[in-house]
């Protein structure tokens, strides 16, 4: 049974900051498994490019929501919310504290705050919009979105065709503005939530990210990306590390440039993560090495 005597510890931070090592120490202190909050580690075909926990690390501490789905599978933050809450019901029967760790902002919010109950669009509406996009580009779709949902139009990234199309397909399928489904209050959870954020100075983090990309290449990222190249159209592969390698395979850039772009885009993603996390005043921030002892004390 979940009660306020049970605690979900959320270890979060940007890519490359050092969450994995500290998460293992925290989980061992708690004596419980780790729940991954990484929207790409959930796909079994992508262990290298997503820096998924190794078999040795998973043998040391069980990990949930790692390698459980194929990139061919549809998976969403809403599905993740439901499945994690079900898993926590069982885990809290055995453990007073459980660790959730990752850097996927939407997945963390899904568990901690809940996400909006947005209806699925009609398949024929989605197909028609994607056909329009392929034939005409995004301008006409943007104009229609602006007419039907000016609030969402004002804040959506208008270069991201998937988000633009998603907003319009919900408008057309439901007869309501997509923005009208967005809630602003968090759902209540029957357990305490303690958020632990990890940070490093920007220069230090960038060096770690660049080095990690080189390490991924040595581990076989190129071969991993080639194996899923025939599936490049899937949303799961619209991901840093893979889309750059696909450009290399297409012949539009060389291998060295692909690596540089992975490093650059990983640094950009880390900045976006920190921008998102800084909006949450409930996060307590720590350095993963200098403050390690304080963090471990916090979870005991």
From Swiss-Prot:
Q: Which GO terms describe its molecular function?
A: ATP binding; tRNA dimethylallyltransferase activity
In chain numbering, the residues marked as site (Interaction with substrate tRNA) are 104, 126
Q: Which Pfam families match?
A: IPPT (PF01715)
Which cofactors go with this protein? Mg(2+)
Residue sites binding substrate per the record: 15-20
Q: What is one Gene Ontology biological process annotated in the Swiss-Prot or TrEMBL record?
A: tRNA modification
User: Between which residues do disulfide bridges form?
Assistant: none
InterPro entries reported for this sequence: Dimethylallyltransferase, IPT, P-loop_NTPase
What ranges does the record give for the region Interaction with substrate tRNA, renumbered to this chain? 38-41
- Enzyme class, top EC level, equals transferase
Q: Which residues bind ATP?
A: 13-20
Signal peptide segment: none
What reactions does this protein catalyze? Answer: adenosine(37) in tRNA + dimethylallyl diphosphate = N(6)-dimethylallyladenosine(37) in tRNA + diphosphate
Q: Which SUPFAM superfamilies match?
A: P-loop containing nucleoside triphosphate hydrolases
**What keywords is this UniProt entry annotated with?**
ATP-binding, Magnesium, Nucleotide-binding, Transferase, tRNA processing
EC assignment: 2.5.1.75
Tell me how this protein assembles.
Monomer.
- Tell me, in a sentence or two, what this protein's role is: Catalyzes the transfer of a dimethylallyl group onto the adenine at position 37 in tRNAs that read codons beginning with uridine, leading to the formation of N6-(dimethylallyl)adenosine (i(6)A).
Family designation: Belongs to the IPP transferase family.
This protein is called tRNA dimethylallyltransferase 1
Per the UniProt entry, what species is this protein from, by scientific name? Porphyromonas gingivalis (strain ATCC BAA-308 / W83)
């Amino acid at each position: 049974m979940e009660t306020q005597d049970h605690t979900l510890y959320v270890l979060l931070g940007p890519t490359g900051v050092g969450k994995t090592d500290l998460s293992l120490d925290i989980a061992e202190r708690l004596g419980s498994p780790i729940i991954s909050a990484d929207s790409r580690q959930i796909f079994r075909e992508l262990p290298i490019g997503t820096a998924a926990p190794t078999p040795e690390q998973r043998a040391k501490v069980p990990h949930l929501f790692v390698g459980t789905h194929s990139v061919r599978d549809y998976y969403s933050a809403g599905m993740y919310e439901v499945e994690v809450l079900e898993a926590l019901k069982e885990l809290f029967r055995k453990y007073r504290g459980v660790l959730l760790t990752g850097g996927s902002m939407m997945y963390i919010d899904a568990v901690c705050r809940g996400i909006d109950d947005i209806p699925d669009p009609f398949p024929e509406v989605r197909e028609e919009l994607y056909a329009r996009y392929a034939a005409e580009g995004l301008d006409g779709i943007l104009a229609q979105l602006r007419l039907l949902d000016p609030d969402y139009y004002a804040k959506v990234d208008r270069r991201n065709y998937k988000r633009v199309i998603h907003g319009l397909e919900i408008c057309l399928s439901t007869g309501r503005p997509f923005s009208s489904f967005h809630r602003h209050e968090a759902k209540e959870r029957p357990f305490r939530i303690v958020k632990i954020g990890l940070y490093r100075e920007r220069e230090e983090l960038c060096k770690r990210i660049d080095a990690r990309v080189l390490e991924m290449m040595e581990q076989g990222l190129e071969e991993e990306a080639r194996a899923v190249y025939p599936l490049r159209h899937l949303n799961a592969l619209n991901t840093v590390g893979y889309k750059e390698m696909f450009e290399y395979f297409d012949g539009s850039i060389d291998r060295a440039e692909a690596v540089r772009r992975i490093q650059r885009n990983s640094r950009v993603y880390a900045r976006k993560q920190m921008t998102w996390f800084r909006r949450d005043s409930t996060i307590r921030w720590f350095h993963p090495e200098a403050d390690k002892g304080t963090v471990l004390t916090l979870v005991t």
